[in-house]
Amino acid sequence: MGKSEGRAQTLDLDLRLNLSTRKNYETTNMKLQYFELDKPYVENQQRVEELMDSAALTYEEARIKDYRQNWKDLRRAFVYESKCMTSMVERLFKPVVTKDCWKIIVECVDTISNPSIMNLLGVYTVQVLFDFSSYKTLSPLEQKKLLLEALLKGLKRVFKELSIPCSLIEDVVNEIEKNDYENSWEWKRKKIQSTIFSIQVEHQLDKVDLFWKIEQKDKSIRQLIQSYPAHEMDYGAKLCKLEAKGNFLYLLDKENEVVSKLELETIAE
């Protein structure tokens, strides 16, 4: 690639690697139910050329090294932050049967390098403009609004391409606005005698908090279980089942290990 080529080039190594494992790709009866905001790699041509010269790398090798050294962590941080809104959209959105789409990725970019809507193994990707400099200066609430705005803009483009009514996603956005952009929900509850025990999830930009909520006739108590990174991959496996055994109520993970426990006699006092 010559130096005269001025537009930003994008790289999505993780996505390609992940999707290459989907050997049984089908083009019919897919359910669209997953959404993601991404910060795709923007090539720094000077850095790439310096890597080529200093480490005797090919152009592609230098780009991959530059991505891993200078971009991968930034991208991961943005994806994790944006999960606060994208996971809320996924939770409220009713899956739609499509011909060939199960996920939509909206790439947030300073400059549109690819105006087309791309489809790779059922994952549709579209780019939207995003002001990262402004985003960093905003309050958490305003950051959530900007993230949701970018997601909505990209989803509407793909929905129109797939002839999906945009009202389906607009209704979800309205619900999020009514909830003041707070991504909180009850995962599971269990009633023991007259007391209701539940697990509450609070998904913020920088973390996910899991709580016990204990509701009795005359009082309600919340206890923090633990905080996790803001991605389903980090906290999702902790939520498997609530099990009462003896004098304890256990939160068990998917390996049947104890995440947290409550002593029922103590609660009853």
Feature locations, PLM:
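A residue-identity detector for tryptophan
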Residues: M1, L13, W71, W102, ...
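N-terminal amphipathic/basic-hydrophobic helices that include classical n-h-c signal peptides
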Residues: M1-E26
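Extended rod-forming repeat segments used as scaffolds/tethers
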Residues: T10, L19-T21, M88, E177, ...
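Short, flexible coil/linker elements and helix-boundary hinge sites characteristic
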Residues: D12, N18, A56, K160-S163, ...
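Acidic, small-residue rich beta-repeat scaffolds with periodic aromatic anchors
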Residues: L13, Y25-K153, E232-E269
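Intrinsically disordered regions, especially transient/low-confidence alpha-helical propensity segments
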Residues: R68, K99, E182-S184, D209
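Long amphipathic alpha-helical scaffold segments
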Residues: K136-R189
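C-terminal, beta-strand-rich globular interaction domains
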Residues: K188-E269
